[in-house]
């Protein structure tokens, strides 16, 4: 009988060694994981399977990741969103967009909008603006993080400042002492 520790160790090894494998081995492992994840009943094991799948850049990993983005466990959906965010494909963008718009768990929506920030285009811009306008501060912050990746700009932590920037303004960034030292020392914030 295989224990949880054995499975965890094997999946961790698989994840850590994926990049060094030949393409054929990556395809073999990604195909097997994509199939196994659909049969696995234990959420923690599925979670580790998804983490391993994310490490495989081959298309064969995508069926397992697509299954994972609709998993009943929100933590698994979050990891799937992060994984899809590393894949710059139309399929990845569409799945993330659907998840951002329809998932009921805030953590999953946050992960989806953060991942959407890795993409380019007008639709990405529009979705990030929607995130900035959301009522939930976690979603607003995810929108800010997405815009930082999308634009390379840094307008602080205030969603209103970012919204002004999206409308073509060069907003004044004022610091009220609640920012962390990293924000204060960011070169983009020192030389405005």
Mark where each language-model region is.
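Short inter-helical turns and helix N-cap capping residues of alpha-solenoid HEAT/ARM repeat scaffolds
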Residues: 2-3, 41-42, 72-73, 104-105, ...
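Amphipathic alpha-helical scaffolding segments comprising HEAT/armadillo-like alpha-solenoid repeats
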Residues: 1, 20-39, 58-70, 89-102, ...
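Core register positions within helices of long alpha-helical scaffolds
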Residues: 13, 52-55, 83-86, 115-118, ...
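Conserved hydrophobic register position within alpha-solenoid helical repeats
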Residues: 10, 49, 80, 112, ...
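Terminal, low-structured helical/coil segments at or just beyond the last alpha-helical repeat
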Residues: 153-192
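Alpha-helical adaptor scaffolds
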Residues: 51, 63-67, 74-114
